[in-house]
Regions:
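C-terminal catalytic/acceptor-binding lobe
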Residues: 100-145
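The conserved acidic donor/metal-binding loop of glycosyltransferases
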Residues: 1-4
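Acceptor/aglycone-binding surface of glycosyltransferases and processive sugar-polymer synthases
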Residues: 7-87, 114-131
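Catalytic donor-sugar/metal-binding loop of nucleotide-sugar-dependent glycosyltransferases
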Residues: 57-58, 81-85, 94-112
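Short-chain dehydrogenase/reductase
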Residues: 90
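Short, hydrophobic alpha-helical packing/hinge segments within bilobed ligand-binding/sensory domains
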Residues: 65, 93-94
Length: 145
């Protein structure tokens, strides 16, 4: 709603959902951009890098919420298996999609920083995300669904 994500990209999402179950708008693949202040950019970029490193998944974007789901496949996704809440939900969704081998694709997007206001993410949420990240790593290591 703050136009950080360009609504014109939605048609690309819809087109790709014909052949994929999940589409992720990615700031960190070729063609993608993240136009935000340097501090927020560093937190976002290194946060995504750290998640990718810990979970060892072939994805570049874990924290962006600009995504599309194929509704026919969403029924078999079992959303109740995603225990992550708040902002960790975005990371948890990618983890579950990759671990259950759903067909997904990342497409480049341009993310623009909001023009007014502050980040909506409370600092405690970063701590919760770290706890959820290591919980997901444990699940992956122990091969728990």
């Amino acid at each position: 709603a703050d136009l950080s994500h360009d609504p014109k990209e939605i048609s690309n999402f819809i087109k790709l959902l014909g052949s994929h179950e999940f589409v992720i708008g990615s700031r960190y693949i070729e063609g993608g951009k993240c136009l935000m202040n340097p501090r927020r950019l560093a937190i976002s970029k290194y946060g995504n890098w750290f998640i990718k490193l810990i979970l060892n998944l072939n994805c570049s974007e874990f924290t962006n919420s600009y995504r599309g789901f194929n509704l026919n496949k969403l029924k078999s996704f079992h959303l109740n298996l995603i225990k992550e809440k708040g902002y960790s939900f975005f990371m948890g969704t990618v983890y579950h999609i990759c671990s259950r081998k759903f067909a997904y694709v990342e497409i480049p997007i341009v993310f623009k920083d909001r023009q007014k206001g502050e980040s909506k993410i409370p600092k405690i949420e970063i701590f919760r995300t770290l706890i959820n990240l290591f919980r997901l790593k444990l699940k992956k290591t122990l091969r728990i669904k």
